[in-house]
Amino acid sequence: MISVVIPAYNEEEAIGTVVDELIEILKEWSYEIIVVDDGSTDNTAKVVQEKRVKIIQHPHNIGYGAAIKTGIKNAANDLIMIIDGDGSYPVKAIPELLKVADHYDMIVGSRTGGEVKIQLYRRPAKRFLSMLANYLSETKIPDLNSGMRIFRRKEVEKFFNILPNKFSFTTTITLTYHTTGLLVKYVPINYYKRVGQSKIRPVKDGLNFIMLIVRTITYFNPLKVFLPISIVLFLIGLAVLLYQGIFLRNIADLPVMLIIAAFQIGFLGLLADLIVRKR
């Protein structure tokens, strides 16, 4: 038994087709489909109401993550699948994800298949975010923020307090599962050009993603963030100190302050790590 949660905001052009495809592909399973209309101003709700699915409507736009959490809270089953309502994810790939659902805590549809339509201007930022996430989480993550994945309600609800209400929901849940030792399986899928206009703001959302990655890793593994900063400051301070002492014969306040700051940040990281381990 599986509950499929579809967060939707102004997706009138694609949501009907997505729901129809889900009903067809899931006919051999016991399932429910929950569409969470996140305050759409178009005919999204009207289109969904004509289908044999459950619809929940937010009174106004709260966010992608908030819509997913609403769907999870109202799901009848422990096994949850999320998929976007814009037609960009291949519904026909769902059976492949379900095949391994009993063996992993989360199965992610990784957009690394043979046909992947990601806009060119988004690829450098996506690559940078992936490299940052891979380093901080010490894990190879093929797709950090795929919107097609399966997980269990009892597991994800443990992290509701740190899962954001915006687009960064998927990024956070990926990092959270990896840094807490849960098993994640990536299944390659295709990814198509979405129907309608994207709601992502490249610059603002990109900066938010960076902050989110650092914050999430700090929450679970603070030394991974604090220690590199401490080492860099110490090395810079030491280099300046040696330069001033050897060549200028006069040591200013800057290198001393940098070295002191390095030790302070390092000890702060150690303290944060002790707190995390006692949780």
Name each region found by the language model:
Residues D37-A45, G87:
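A conserved acidic beta->alpha catalytic loop
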Residues H58-N74, L79, V91-F167, T171, ...:
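Acceptor/aglycone-binding surface of glycosyltransferases and processive sugar-polymer synthases
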Residues E11-A14, S40, P90:
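Donor nucleotide-sugar binding loop of glycosyltransferases
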Residues S30-I34, A45-N74:
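Conserved donor nucleotide-binding strand/loop of the catalytic core
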Residues N165-R279:
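Hydrophobic helical membrane-anchoring modules
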Residues M1-S3, E32, T172:
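Cell-envelope/extracellular polymer assembly enzymes that use nucleotide-activated donors
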